[in-house]
């Protein structure tokens, strides 16, 4: 087997004969592009390595793509707009520079027999996939999975570290996500999922956010530190368990999660931004809290006790910003939006604790900061 060097050039396959021209080559140095006019199935036989990327854009009549011997793609594996593709078979593939699969509505499964264990990033959007079996990453940069409305389960069992955003949004409402061995990461955001399992997660450098999900319970038994922490509009959420969470390096918001009756973070000591809890809960326990650099807003329809938090605000000993704590029929978030699904969010007279507002400036959080920009505040 030989090596063909196409560095600085892109080889375009317009038909199977073009692809067969590579069959005597174990290594292709350069990029391989499949023509957007290709129709039917395409096989890349014999090739074991592509140093550049492998791509196909707009081949709406391509039905299958396979490469039984290919074990690595040095750059991006990019497939876009292959609207009739039903087969993607790469039995030996274990390493890619990155994966970008977009608009593959007929593709229901990945035939990656050995499993892709190395990828700089993964973006999968608007496909027919029901699972991500075949993606067996141990580490990854970004992991962005969106608009896959047939996606039922994601279990990346071997993943231990992520260095960029992990994002799930717009997939099947019943999507169940498992990262059983993920220990550290950057940012993680989840929308419209039915369960998230992160039993080994210990530390996030960025945010952890949940919006509009359907799960009843969330547990992070080993998480000690994260940046912004957000639970917003999770209508069925009745339990949050983070028994060893100690530090939130940013803002902490719980809002519009009306089934949540008790808020309890027994080991939480430090929040460097604002605390913003609103809803219909009856109890709130932050027994270890020593420092809140920003404002403190707690509003609920439930009969909450504010004595402890009022005392924390005295002389700015714990709460450095403005403290608002009250029972009200219209709980609001810190920025005046409705804090429960039954509240109006209209402005109303409030009583505040002893701490007056500091001259604070907003510091944008990492990742999707615009979603909750005003939440994160730091004392000057």
Predicted regions and their residues:
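N-terminal signal peptide
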Residues: 1-7, 375-380
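Concave beta-strand-loop units of leucine-rich repeat
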Residues: 5-21, 28-43, 50-85, 89-107, ...
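Short, intrinsically disordered, charge-biased short linear motifs at domain edges
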Residues: 311-314, 357-359
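Acidic, glycine- and Ser/Thr-rich low-complexity intrinsically disordered tracts
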Residues: 320-341, 370-373
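Low-complexity, Pro/Ser/Thr-rich intrinsically disordered segments
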Residues: 330, 336-358
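Cleavable C-terminal sorting propeptides in eukaryotic secreted/cell-surface proteins
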Residues: 351-380
């Amino acid at each position: 087997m030989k090596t063909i060097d196409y560095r600085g050039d892109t080889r375009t396959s317009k038909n199977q004969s073009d692809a067969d021209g590579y069959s005597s080559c174990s290594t292709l140095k350069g990029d391989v592009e499949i023509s957007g006019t290709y129709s039917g199935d395409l096989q890349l036989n014999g090739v074991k390595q592509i140093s550049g990327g492998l791509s196909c854009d707009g081949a709406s009549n391509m039905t299958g793509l396979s490469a039984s011997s290919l074990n690595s793609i040095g750059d991006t594996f990019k497939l876009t707009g292959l609207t009739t593709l039903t087969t993607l078979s790469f039995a030996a593939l274990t390493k890619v520079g990155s994966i970008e699969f977009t608009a593959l509505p007929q593709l229901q499964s990945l035939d990656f027999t050995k499993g892709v264990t190395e990828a700089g990033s993964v973006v999968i959007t608007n496909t027919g996939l029901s699972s991500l079996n075949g993606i067996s990453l141990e580490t990854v940069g970004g992991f962005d999975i969106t608009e896959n409305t047939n996606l039922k389960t994601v279990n990346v069992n071997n993943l231990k570290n992520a260095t960029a955003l992990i994002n799930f949004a717009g997939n099947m409402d019943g999507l169940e996500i498992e990262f059983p061995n993920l220990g550290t990461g950057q940012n993680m955001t989840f929308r419209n999922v039915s369960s998230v399992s992160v039993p080994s997660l210990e530390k996030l450098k960025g945010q952890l956010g949940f919006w509009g999900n359907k799960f009843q319970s969330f547990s992070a038994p080993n998480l000690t530190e994260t940046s912004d922490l957000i639970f917003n509009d999770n209508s069925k959420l009745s339990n949050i368990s983070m028994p060893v969470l100690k530090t939130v390096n940013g803002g902490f918001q719980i809002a519009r999660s009306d089934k949540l009756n008790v808020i309890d973070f027994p080991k939480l000591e430090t929040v460097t931004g604002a605390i913003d809890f609103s809803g219909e809960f009856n109890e709130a326990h932050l027994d270890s809290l020593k420092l809140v650099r920003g404002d403190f807003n707690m509003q609920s329809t439930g009969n909450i006790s504010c004595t402890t938090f009022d005392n924390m605000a005295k002389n700015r000993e714990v709460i450095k910003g403005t403290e608002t704590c009250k029972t009200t029929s219209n709980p609001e978030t810190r920025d005046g939006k409705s804090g429960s699904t039954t509240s109006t969010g209209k402005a109303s007279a409030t009583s505040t604790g002893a701490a007056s507002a500091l001259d604070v400036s907003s510091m944008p959080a990492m990742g999707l900061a615009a979603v909750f920009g005003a939440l994160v505040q730091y004392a000057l």
